[in-house]
Every structure is written in structure tokens, then in C-alpha cells.
């Protein structure tokens, strides 16, 4: 087979043997590092991988040849938890955070999520589209090729649908692949204050059926937290969503452990998000149910908290984990997955191999794209992040700098030295 594109002489390729399930425990610690590696691409797919000189049959008169001495290649990075589409910003809350006002106290004062809800409700489709596109561009320039994007800053049907429509439009227009999550249960809207059950009934009866009918989202999520939605309320919504055919996620054990992990395990959610306050019993329940733990260390950093999710304990117990940005305007205003990956080492005490497994193959399972992306594997799409680094440890050791040299998306050179092509 003659390749369309042949990428050769990488210092290292980060490869793994996909076992057919998210990596857990000791599997997280393993990878195949191919020295002097090459990748052959045809019709947007990886058709060959190896070390040294490529087979002659891969090279034809039209084959594009590129050498990458001094560089490494990983699968395209996957950010599997973002609140991508929103209006406004919340830098006016930053001084309050520095003064020690808590996230929940800011929310109780009408700030936080509710502040962004007001800004998003008043934002036009075009405003939200352009703002979200800029964030996606930034992500792409940092090596991200697939992104999960939630609604949840509307808390009414008109705005929630506008957010989902923006995600759908960007999925068509932008190189990054987007996976949509419906999260109208992100907070209790002011018009339903004191009556969350009534709001959940509106979501279940009036919103979820339309989202499903129009295929606007693949996943459903809820914020199970003190002063937001209880475990029983979360169970009520997610069980109805599951009956309608949605895959499930849940924000759980972020600030307080109130039973969200139990709901995730009972309903076999694909992932449970945050988990800073998870207990040993909670870890065991998620392992038993096969739920992926999606950890968001940049949120802990941004909130200036000391309690990071116990990633080391999770992996050693046999749990599958991913890492994501939680990109949002309040608790985590960043879109930089490289920073998150570095926090995975510095604050969660993970190794570079564990972090790379978390943000590639496990993240692919978390967004139900494991058949297409998440590993440098023959037959998968050629989503490739190329780092200006001599080995896989270097992008973690040399922190706070964008080391992306190039990005390939479905076999097309999409980013070249800081420019989107």
C-alpha cells in the first residue's frame, strides 16, 4: 500500500496496545515507546507504524515525506470535560476568590454559574460561536484534537438549545471533533429557586425528548453538589435520561461527598467528574461499576484549594482515570491541556506515561470515540500531536510552555509551528 503521507524519524512515538477497555491499574503505567519511529497515513487513517526506515512499498511518487528528528509524536490529545460555550467572563470574581470567598458563597450571592447564565442568555448565536471558536483554536494549537462540550449556562430551553446548536455548528466547521453533552442541570435557575424538582421535571418532560429527537447531545450530565442538586435529584434526572438512550456523566464529590459517586455506580455512568472529595468506599464503587474517573486538577488549582483528587490512590486501586481542563469562565478559566497534563505530574504525582494514557486512550473511552481515536494504532484516524521535545518526559519537565510543533487531524497537517493552516 502506498501512503499519502509518511512521517519519519521521530525520536519517539508514544504507542500502546489498546486492550479493548479503558486502562486501569498497572495498565496505566505501560506504553510502547518506539524509537526512530515512523507513521504512514492514507485516506486520513494510520496504515503503518514502525521503527527505522519505512517499507519501500509505502512510498510512491505522490507520497509526502516529512522527517521529525528531535521530535516526538503522541495521539491527538482529548479534552473530555469542558464548558465550552458561554457568554461573558468572570474576572470580577477573582478578587473575591483571592480574599477567600468560597465558590459556593459566590454562587449564593448570585455570582458564579448564575452570573454566566445571565450573560449567556443575552448572547447571540454568533457571539457564542465566535467566542467558542477562539477557545477551540487555542486548544488545537496546544495539541487537542477532540473535545467534549457541555451546555448548562442557559438553564432555559432557548439558551440551552442555542449552546447545543453552537456545538453542532463548530463540529461541522472546526478541525477539532466535538462531543456534545446536555447539562441543563448545571445549577438551579433563579426562577426555580427552592424548587429544584420542578425544574428537573421541565428538563425531563420538555427538554430531553427534543435533545434526543434532534440528536443534539450524546451525553447527559448533572451537578450533584451541596446547595445544587442532591443525590436523589441526580438519580431522578439521570435515570430518566438513561431510559431515553443518553450516556451518562455526573459532576460528583467536588466540594462535598453527598452521594454522587453512588449514583454514578448505580446507573453505570460512563464517567464521574471532579472527585476531589471521594472516599475509599467511593473509589471501590466506581471500580466495581467500571466508571471512569475524570479528574480536573486545574480546577483545584484555580480555586486555590489544597485537596486534589487522589489520583495515585485511584490508579493503584485499579481505577481508570482521565484528565481534562474543565474549561469554564469561573472555577477554571483555562483551555490549556498541556498545563493540565503537567499538573497531573506535579500535583497528582502521576508519571508522564500515566498522564498520556489518561488524556489519550482513556479519554477516548470517556467520550465514546475509542474506535476512531485515542491511540497511534493502524486503522484509527491519524490524529497526531507532534511535540518539539527529545522524549516523552520532556513536555512535563519543561512546563508552562507550548511545545507543540505540529498537529495532524485525520491525516491533514492542521497546525504548523503556532499557526492553524
Swiss-Prot record:
Which pathway does the record list? Amino-acid degradation; L-histidine degradation into L-glutamate; N-formimidoyl-L-glutamate from L-histidine: step 3/3
**By its UniProt entry, which Pfam families does this protein fall under?**
Amidohydro_1
For the biological process aspect of GO, one term held by this record is: L-histidine catabolic process to glutamate and formate
Which cell locations does it reside in? Cytoplasm
State its cofactor: Zn(2+); Fe(3+)
Q: Does the keyword Acyltransferase apply?
A: no
What's one GO MF term for it?
zinc ion binding
Positions that bind Fe(3+): 81, 83, 251, 326
Query: Which of UniProt's keywords are assigned here?
Result: Cytoplasm, Histidine metabolism, Hydrolase, Iron, Metal-binding, Zinc
Return the CDD domains for the record.
Answer: Imidazolone-5PH
Q: Which reaction does it catalyse?
A: 4-imidazolone-5-propanoate + H2O = N-formimidoyl-L-glutamate
**EC code(s) of this entry:** 3.5.2.7
Give the note describing cofactor binding and stoichiometry.
Answer: Binds 1 zinc or iron ion per subunit.
InterPro entries cross-referenced by the UniProt entry: Amidohydro-rel (IPR006680), HutI (IPR005920), Metal-dep_hydrolase_composite (IPR011059), Metal_Hydrolase (IPR032466)
Residues binding Zn(2+): 81, 83, 251, 326
Instruction: Please describe what this protein does.
Output: Catalyzes the hydrolytic cleavage of the carbon-nitrogen bond in imidazolone-5-propanoate to yield N-formimidoyl-L-glutamate. It is the third step in the universal histidine degradation pathway.
Please give the name of this protein: Imidazolonepropionase
